[in-house]
Amino acid sequence: GIGISNTPQECGKELTQMYESNVNDVLISCGGGELMCEILPYVDFDRIKAAKPKWYLGYSDNTNFTFLQNTIADTASVYGPCAGAFAMKDWHQALVDTFDVLRGKGCKNNNGVVEKQVHGYDTWERESLKNEENPAPQYNLTEKKILRKYVGGDECDTEIAFEGRLVGGCMDCLVNLTGTSFDKVK
C-alpha cells in the first residue's frame, strides 16, 4: 500500500483497535483515497461487531468501511465530510448537520433506535477551491441539485416518501465490494 499511512496489515489492525478503544466516541477520517480496500482483509469485523457501536465518518474510499459497518456489524455510520472540511471558517449547513448527528442533536430515540430526519441541499460543489495557499476554503457551490425519480424504470413526477436506514456510499467502492467475501447484502 504505497499512498496510505502504513502497511495494509497495520492500517487494518489500527482501525480495529481504534474502533474498540474506550478513549474516543467517533472516528473521523482524514480523507478519501483509493487504497482502503487493501486493508479490509486485516480489519477484524468480528471484533468491530462485538465492540460498543460508535460513529465512523468519512466519504469516498471510506465507503469500504462505512458500508461494511452497516452490513456486517449492523451499526450506523455517516457517509459525509472528512476531518479537514471542519476547518473552514464558516461551516456550510451540511457540516452543521453532520456535527449535530455526531452529537445526537435533533435525534429522537424510538425504543432504542436513534432516528434523525435528513434532507439534501440546493447546490453542490463540482470543483473545490482547495490548494496549498487555501487549505480550508468554503464550499464552491456552483451546481444546482436536480433530482429525478424513477419507479420501475420510468421517470415519475409524483411525490415519493420512504423511511428506513439509508445505506450507500461511493459507487465504484460499492461495485468493487460486490461478490467479495465482504458482500453481506441480502
Summary of predicted features, one role per range:
Residues 1-23:
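ATP/NTP phosphate-donor binding region
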Residues 28-42:
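N-terminal glycine-rich "phosphate-gripper" loop used for MgATP/nucleotide binding
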Residues 32-34, 62-63, 172:
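Short glycine-enriched loops at secondary-structure junctions
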Residues 43-68, 76-84:
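Short, acidic/small-residue loops that bind anionic groups at enzyme active sites
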Residues 76-172:
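Conserved anion/nucleotide-ligand pocket segment
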Residues 166-186:
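Oxyanion-binding "anion nests"
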